Regions:
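Amphipathic alpha-helical polymerization modules
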Residues: 1-139
Length: 139
C-alpha cells in the first residue's frame, strides 16, 4: 500500500502545482511591462510571464507506474502587445506587453486541478481506512 500512497501523494503535489500556476496567472493577468526589443531584450520592467503546469509519469525500473512528476514552464506565446500610450512602459508606438492569459482556460485548469486533487485525496483516505481495518483484523 505504500506504493499506492506514494502515487496519490505525488498526484496531490502535482495538482497543487497546477492550481498554484493557474491562480498566479489570474492574479498577475494585468501586470504589464515593456515589450521585448531587438534580440528579445526588455528595456524597463518586464511583464508577468504566464506559466503552465507540466506533468509526466514516473516509472520504476521494471516499468511500473510510481506517480507523477510535475513542474511549470512559460507559455509558448506568453506576451501580447496592447495599446496603452499612458503607460510608463509604452514604446514609441504606445504599445506595452500584456500577459497572454485566457481566463476560460484558467478556470478549466482550476476546476480540473480541484477535482483531480479530490480524487487523489480519496485514494489516501481509502488506503488509510483499509490499513486500519487490516490492523483491527489482526488484533
Amino acid at each position: 500500500m505504500n506504493g499506492t500512497l506514494g502515487i496519490a501523494f505525488s498526484g496531490l503535489a502535482a495538482e497543487t502545482r497546477r492550481i498554484d500556476a493557474s491562480a498566479s496567472n489570474v492574479a498577475n493577468a494585468r501586470v504589464t511591462g515593456a515589450l521585448p526589443g531587438k534580440g528579445g531584450v526588455t528595456e524597463g520592467r518586464a511583464p508577468y510571464v504566464p506559466v503552465a503546469a507540466t506533468q509526466g509519469d514516473v516509472r520504476t525500473g521494471d516499468g511500473q507506474g510510481a506517480g507523477v512528476r510535475s513542474g511549470v514552464k512559460p507559455l509558448s506565446s506568453p506576451i501580447v502587445a496592447e495599446y496603452d500610450p499612458s503607460s510608463s512602459d509604452a514604446n514609441s508606438q504606445g504599445m506595452v506587453g500584456v500577459p497572454n492569459v485566457d481566463y476560460g482556460a484558467e478556470v478549466s485548469q482550476q476546476i480540473l486541478g480541484s477535482r483531480a486533487y479530490s480524487a487523489n485525496l480519496s485514494v489516501v483516505r481509502t488506503t488509510d481506512e483499509m490499513t486500519r481495518d487490516l490492523l483491527n483484523m489482526r488484533t
